[in-house]
């Protein structure tokens, strides 16, 4: 009985150690933009990251991909970005303060690829 209780406690502890990592990966943010979430199912490509800090503002390029539809990704950002202070502009552009965010969603087949670009307004 004591052994069964210890094994149960160990299993529950292990579940709590693993669960936060899975939740974090599923609801992650871009590595270089801590307030720009990744749509569910997307994983950032570390090789695509480029960041420059300039006196006039930052320039960030990033990409993510996943087995999701382009429509689901577009809907996610259309619903999420306004709550983060971004205002939709023509095409794929969003504006917040002195920055412009561009989202390019490409689906030539699985996976969908999303390219993020943040630059100062001109």
PLM features: what roles do these ranges have?
Residues 2-6, 22-122:
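An acidic-aromatic pocket/loop used at catalytic or ligand-binding sites
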Residues 9-19:
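Bacterial N-terminal signal peptides
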